[in-house]
């Protein structure tokens, strides 16, 4: 016949297994390949947008690794808490244990977190390096944050005029069949399968130039030039926004971004 201690251990193990099964079943049902949409948020979506660049591919991979690690930690901690609450409750232990330490446990809870942090840190550092080091680029774009819009320049193309992307109001967005608070009156256009450098700054408030499908979020700071790069791996329309709470009309600073095919670079 099983002892109370064995029953408690079994119960805690069941809790851990159920938690893990529910977590990974949810992952299997919803998928970890990105929210399927035209480069914009999906109603009811909870996951990252579908990747449209090599950098976002790596962001998604790192996110997935961390998600699995966190899920395993949650299942383990929940099972451990249940085990402790039942096994070491006052009724089962009228005389408290006077154990002061356990060398093996202390080694485990020191070494295991270090291993977990290394598993997370190594790919994260590689990703940060990949994002920060601007590769050989064929197109350069300068984005200047204003109140409350983005102004774009093509420094390498003197024959291309600068323009300001203004947000569409609710009526204009509805008539154009575009998402309100995401669409603008003028798209930023760059070719697909091309390394593009983005130079970002601001004339007034701090902003953040963000395109989730490309894994880009870079601060626009007055008097400072920041830069990053991306490579659109497929054609389409991708929406972004300012991700820095910059003032009263922060919600109006939108990005509408399209990637034509190489033959349409014109």
Regions found by a protein language model. Name each.
Residues 3, 27-66, 85-259, 263-265:
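Non-transmembrane, membrane-proximal soluble domains of secreted or membrane proteins
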Residues 3-18, 106:
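Alpha-helical transmembrane segments and their helix-start/interface "positive-inside/aromatic belt" motifs
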Residues 14-29:
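Hydrophobic alpha-helical membrane-insertion segments
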Residues 70:
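Active-site-proximal cofactor/substrate-binding loop regions of enzyme domains
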Residues 74-87:
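Alpha-helical transmembrane segments
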């Amino acid at each position: 016949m099983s002892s109370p201690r064995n029953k408690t251990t079994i119960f805690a193990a069941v809790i851990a297994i159920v938690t893990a099964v529910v977590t990974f079943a949810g992952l299997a049902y919803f998928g970890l390949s990105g929210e399927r949409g035209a480069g914009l948020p999906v109603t009811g979506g909870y996951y990252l947008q579908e990747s449209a660049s090599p950098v976002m591919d790596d962001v998604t991979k790192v996110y997935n690794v961390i998600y699995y690690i966190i899920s395993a930690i949650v299942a383990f901690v929940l099972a451990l808490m249940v085990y402790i609450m039942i096994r070491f409750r006052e009724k089962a232990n009228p005389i408290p244990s006077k154990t002061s330490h356990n060398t093996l446990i202390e080694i485990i809870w020191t070494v295991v977190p270090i291993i977990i942090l290394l598993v997370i840190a190594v790919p994260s550092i590689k990703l940060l390096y990949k994002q920060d080091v601007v590769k050989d680029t064929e197109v350069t774009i300068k984005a200047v944050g204003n109140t409350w819009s983005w102004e774009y320049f093509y420094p390498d193309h003197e024959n291309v005029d600068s323009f300001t992307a203004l947000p569409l109001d609710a009526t204009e967005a509805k008539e154009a069949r575009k998402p309100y608070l995401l669409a603008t009156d003028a798209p930023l256009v760059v070719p697909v399968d091309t390394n593009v450098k983005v130079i970002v700054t601001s004339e007034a408030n701090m902003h953040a130039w963000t395109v989730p499908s490309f894994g880009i979020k870079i601060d626009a700071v007055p008097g400072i030039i920041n830069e990053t790069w991306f490579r659109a791996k497929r054609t389409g329309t991708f929406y972004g926004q300012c991700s820095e709470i910059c003032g009263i009309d922060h919600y109006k600073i939108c990005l509408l971004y399209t990637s034509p095919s190489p033959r349409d670079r014109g």
